[in-house]
Amino acid sequence: MDFIDRWKSLGGAAQVPAVRESEADNVVPVIICASEERVGATMATINSVHSNTDASVFFYIVTLRDAVKLTRQYIEKTKLKGIKYKILEFNPMVLRGKVKPDSSRPDLLHPLNFVRFYLPLLDISHKRVIYLDDDVIVQGDIKDLFNIKLKPGHAAAFATDCDLPSTHEMVRSIGMQTTYMGFLDYRKQEVKDLGIHPRDCSFNPGVFVADVSEWKKQKITKQLEKWMEENFRQNIYSSAMAGGVATPPMLIVFHDKYTTLDPLWHVRHLGWSPDARYSESYLQEARLLHWNGPFKPWNYPAVHLDLWERWFIPDPSGRFLLVRPERDS
């Protein structure tokens, strides 16, 4: 299947041209997905990035056909209308024969969860890109994340799950997985044959910096697809385990082959419990907050709602609404 089958470029605002090759080096390209049901979350992430930097940021917003119009409207009818962006339509047919339906966490099987596997196939001329999940708020200057030094031979930089001593107690209390044992089925021979120790630290693929040319050189997308197909046949990990089916291929392919992000650039687990909280001083220090887990900040209950809501922009169409407890009048 060639590029044109996988992606369709839909352009951004009429006055915003696509980034030319000569300008690409001075731009911070951010890739983020926008699903119809969570479009307001994506816009909060974009708003936080845009508001906290003076860098020239270009947003590549990846969506499915049903959300193209909604996404463009959300930008053009709000304060975001000044951002530079391009909307790309993802064709979910590319996932046929690679992803099995599973009812335990259907949200983790959304086609857009797999966009991160196909980054080099986007019609962009950047050598390096940032990928952000839609349940993220950026409090720091995105160009600091973009300028991280990747080690030679590394196609990406992630935050390791063993990097935050201050969160270990909280992580243990809510049963969050931090090792490969929580993501792969070690009873399966295919997993044993990988030679990955079950207690090796996992990493979170919801925020990363990618070297596109290194990714292509190492054929990362092909490797990821191989493990998706393997799981489709053998069920070597299931969405009942931590991270669903989108995280394990990344963990396998990038095992011991990634640069580590500064922990403050990916403070996570905010969505794993409606009770577990970080200290206010630590959250102020954080450059990026991630509500990974089932308790999202646009729903209720969830923690640290104020840090997310300050970047939320109401949906001009009125379709994306926050879930909040009724207050006594």
PLM features per residue range, with description:
Residues 1-329:
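Glycosyltransferase catalytic domains, chiefly GT-A lineage
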